[in-house]
Each structure stands twice: as C-alpha cells, then as structure tokens.
C-alpha cells in the first residue's frame, strides 16, 4: 500500500497526472488481461524517469518496466510497487546512417522511418508489435532478421539512476536474450547502425513481410504474439499443431486456429486462463514428442 508520504515524495520529481494509483494493467497489455499496479508512472522525460528509478531504489520499492505489453502476460494479482511505463518516451531521430529511438517507440515505426530515409537493416521489424525497449531486451527478430544485426549501442539507467552507454558487445545479444535478463538496467534508447538502401527494394521487402504477417497471424484477437521460443531443429507451432492442440481452449484463452504458435484471448480471458493453457500445451507437447517448449512470452506479477 502506498502511503501519502511516499506519494508526496514522488510528486517532487514527477508530474502528479503521470502517477496512477491502482491502475488496471489490462489497459496496457496486448492480451487485455492482468491485475492492478500499485503505482503506474508515465514519465515524459529522461529526468522524470531517472527520478522514479532512484526513488524506487532509495525507498526499496519493487520496480517493473513496461513498454506496450506486447510480449507480456501479467498475472491476475497485479504488480506491487512501481510500474514504469515508457508510453510517452517515443522519439525517433536519424543522424546520417544511424537511427536513435527512445525505449517506448514502436519498432514498427522505427522501421518505417528508416525506410523514409532510404536506410536498410530494420525491414524485418516492420511487423513486430513491440517497443524498442522490449526489442532490445529479447533481441526481437522475425523472418531471418533480428535486433542483433543492426543495433550499435544502448543508453540505460542503473537501478541507482546512473546513466550508462552499453556497447554492442556488452549487450550480449543471443536468441531471444540479452544482458538485460541478468542485469537490472532500464533502457532509455537504442542506437541502430543502418546502411543506404534502394527505397523500392526496402518497400518491397516490408510489403512482403507485412502481407505474410497479416495472412498467417491471428491479428483479429488480442494476444502476446508468438508464445514459445523455437526449439532447435523444430518449429513450436508445428509441434503444437501435430499434438492436436489447435483450437484447445481454457476459459477465454484459445490456441489459435489460424496459427498454432499463438494463444489468443477470444472472450474475456484471465491471465490464469492464459497461463493454464500455456502449461497444458507444454505438457502435451512434451508427452507426445519429448520436447519441452520454452515460453518466449514473459510472465510477471502475482497470483490472484
């Protein structure tokens, strides 16, 4: 429970209207589910962000970062402490062959701005629904490309609010992983090194990838995207389909009938429904094929 004294202290460094109390997280996730955040902060500047990070550290408050909630399931019990939203930190700029994007910017928008400047390297991201921050954390990728291929560096805060610049090597980018899985950095922006390209060829590739996404993915329902990582030598969606799980349902959550790698919220699903279906899929695939599917989606928060 947040005390009046804690709130008063927060208001010294962040606008009062940017502090939401007991905010429903279902309003901030692609799956449209999740419990309440004790405090939901929406800073508009790096200064406000650094203040909030330092405040959480100095007052021993749990701190959770949130982009646009596209690859996330928040449990029905919600999140204690502070949830720090980057929804207002969305600036994107271009300097020569480099594109600089704030953490809350949509990576789809970054790919479009790169195209506008005839810069190649971010075409793969034209259908990824996440933010720059989320894309860096998980080394997001699609259709043969990934963040690792073009990310130059990142500007971050430590939990004490100190500003650092992290090089490509220090980011430790691997398949759906990075240094952020073990180091508690708060990402402010990413800097991408791109190359000059033919606008017609860039557009052709982006149009092709967008068409593939729209025809193969269940975009008509809320979801967190691809639920599982690709097991070596296999495709998660194919294993799920071959296990007879396409259309399987728990509560309002269903294994998509359009693409078995997705679990969709077809009717007022709770996070408990969604997570239970993830577990059911894992158990069934392991029993049938001896392969344990590892979730790509991040599951956070407390049980109801």
Swiss-Prot record:
Annotated InterPro entries: FAD-bd_PCMH, FAD-bd_PCMH-like_sf, FAD-bd_PCMH_sub1, FAD-bd_PCMH_sub2, MurB, MurB_C, MurB_C_sf, Oxid_FAD_bind_N
Q: Which PROSITE patterns match?
A: FAD_PCMH
Q: What class of enzyme is it?
A: oxidoreductase
EC number(s) per entry: 1.3.1.98
**Which reactions are catalysed by this chain?**
UDP-N-acetyl-alpha-D-muramate + NADP(+) = UDP-N-acetyl-3-O-(1-carboxyvinyl)-alpha-D-glucosamine + NADPH + H(+)
Primary location group: cytoplasm
> Where is the FAD-binding PCMH-type domain positioned along the sequence?
33-212
Record's keyword terms, sorted: Cell cycle, Cell division, Cell shape, Cell wall biogenesis/degradation, Cytoplasm, FAD, Flavoprotein, NADP, Oxidoreductase, Peptidoglycan synthesis
MF GO annotations: FAD binding; UDP-N-acetylmuramate dehydrogenase activity
**Active site residues according to the UniProt entry:** 176, 226, 296
Which cofactor(s) are needed, names only?
FAD
This protein's pathway reads: Cell wall biogenesis; peptidoglycan biosynthesis
Q: Any one cellular component term from GO for this entry?
A: cytosol
Instruction: Write out the GO biological process terms.
Output: cell division; cell wall organization; peptidoglycan biosynthetic process; regulation of cell shape
Q: Subcellular location, in the record's words?
A: Cytoplasm
Q: Which NCBIfam families match?
A: murB (TIGR00179), PRK13905.1 (NF010480)
What is the role of the protein in this entry?
A: Cell wall formation.
**Entry similarity comment:** Belongs to the MurB family.
Q: What's the protein name? A: UDP-N-acetylenolpyruvoylglucosamine reductase
Give the species: Exiguobacterium sibiricum (strain DSM 17290 / CCUG 55495 / CIP 109462 / JCM 13490 / 255-15)
Name of encoding gene: murB
């Amino acid at each position: 429970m947040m005390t009046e004294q804690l709130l008063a202290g927060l208001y010294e460094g962040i606008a009062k209207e940017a502090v939401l109390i007991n905010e429903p997280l279902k309003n901030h996730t692609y799956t449209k589910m999740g419990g309440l955040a004790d405090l939901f902060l929406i800073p508009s500047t790096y200064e406000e962000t650094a203040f909030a990070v330092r405040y959480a550290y100095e007052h021993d408050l749990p701190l959770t970062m949130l982009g646009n909630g596209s690859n996330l399931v928040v449990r029905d019990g919600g999140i204690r402490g502070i949830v720090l939203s980057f929804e207002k930190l969305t600036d994107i700029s271009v300097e020569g062959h480099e594109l600089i994007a704030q953490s809350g910017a949509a990576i789809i928008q970054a790919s479009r701005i790169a195209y506008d400047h005839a810069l190649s390297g971010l075409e793969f991201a034209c259908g990824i629904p996440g933010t720059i921050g989320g894309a860096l954390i998980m080394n997001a990728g699609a259709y043969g490309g990934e963040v690792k291929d073009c990310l130059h560096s990142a500007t971050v805060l430590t939990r004490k609010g100190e500003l650092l610049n992290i090089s490509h090597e220090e980011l430790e980018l691997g398949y759906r992983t990075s240094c952020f899985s073990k180091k508690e950095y708060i990402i402010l922006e990413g800097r991408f090194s791109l190359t000059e390209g033919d606008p017609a060829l860039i557009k052709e590739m982006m149009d092709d990838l967008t068409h593939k996404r729209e025809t193969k993915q269940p975009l008509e329902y809320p979801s967190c995207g691809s639920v599982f990582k690709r097991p070596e030598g296999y495709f998660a969606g194919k294993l799920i389909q071959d296990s007879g799980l396409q259309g399987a349902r728990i509560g309002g959550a269903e294994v998509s009938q359009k693409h078995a790698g997705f679990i969709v919220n077809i009717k007022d699903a709770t996070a408990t429904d969604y997570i239970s279906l993830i577990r059911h899929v894992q158990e069934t695939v392991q029993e049938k094929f001896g392969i344990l599917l590892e979730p790509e989606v991040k599951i956070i928060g407390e049980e109801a």
